[in-house]
A protein has these predicted regions:
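C-terminal functional module detector
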Residues: 1-5, 21, 173-219
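A metal-dependent hydrolase metal-coordination microenvironment
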Residues: 2-119, 128, 135-137, 145-157, ...
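A short helix->loop->beta-strand "cap" motif at the edges of active sites that frequently abuts
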Residues: 44, 161-165
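Generic structural signal for residues positioned in beta-strands
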Residues: 64, 79-81, 141, 187-190, ...
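Residues that form generic nucleotide/phosphate-binding pockets
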Residues: 108, 158, 202, 206
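Structural recognition of alpha->loop->beta junctions
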Residues: 131-150, 186-198
Length: 219
């Protein structure tokens, strides 16, 4: 954190879904406008859309736009959040994935995207295993904080086995009408400007912190 400036904070969420493919995928409730409006109202500086296996160009006129999508078709939710993607990688392992398959996917994605991030590692028991994190490499960040899961055991295992991996936090919003799942988990990035290159550099260098707000049941 030695290069951090306490005056330069960008509030960001990179993981959220909108209606795509005729409403086939989860996120069908959200329109681009709804998602943008909800996060703008909460003061977010960077509002990312990460639709399943598709780059959403709704906000591409914004100078801070970073092409992003969530990769993965498999039934065990072994997904990757791809930030700074050049294109969408269509291939994936649909059913069971062993360690070599998971590593192969990360390696292939790394050739086509700036940041290929294991998403919600603890989402299902047969997805990313805690044991996997002893060996998996070729990624710089892990989505430790996710609106559905917190994966500190996965992160701790990666760090304890010599993998320098930084944290990222996201809502993984699928329905902005449910305010209890909007603005709960996100990333504060220490960067002088809301600029794609500066944001990604800061994430790569660990100049960011994850934020987790607890839900208060009687709010």
């Amino acid at each position: 954190y030695k290069d951090m400036n306490p005056d330069n904070w960008i509030q960001a969420n990179f993981h959220a879904h909108t209606r795509q493919f005729g409403g086939l995928t989860n996120g069908r409730v959200n329109t681009n406008e709804m998602l943008d409006s909800a996060y703008s109202a909460l003061g977010f500086d960077y509002i990312g859309i990460s639709d399943y296996n598709k780059i959403n160009y709704y906000d591409s006129v914004n100078p801070s736009f970073i092409p992003t999508y969530e990769h993965g078709y498999g039934i065990f939710k072994i997904h990757q959040l791809c930030i700074g993607a050049e294109k969408v990688r269509r291939l994936d392992y649909f059913a069971f994935q062993n360690l070599s398959m998971k590593q192969h996917t990360l390696n292939r994605l790394a050739k086509q995207t700036r940041l290929a991030i294991p998403a919600h590692p603890s989402f299902v028991k047969k997805g990313y295993l805690v044991e996997d994190m002893k060996y998996l490499s070729n990624y710089k960040l892990m989505e430790v904080l996710n609106g559905f899961r917190i994966s500190t055991a996965h992160w701790d295992t990666a760090l304890s086995n010599g993998h320098l991996v930084y944290l990222i936090g996201n809502d993984d919003s699928h329905d902005v009408n449910d305010i209890t799942y909007v603005g709960r988990r996100f990333t504060m990035i220490n960067a002088p400007e809301n600029n794609p290159e500066l944001l990604m550099q800061a994430l790569e260098n660990g100049n960011a912190v994850g934020v987790d707000f607890s839900v208060i049941s009687d709010e």
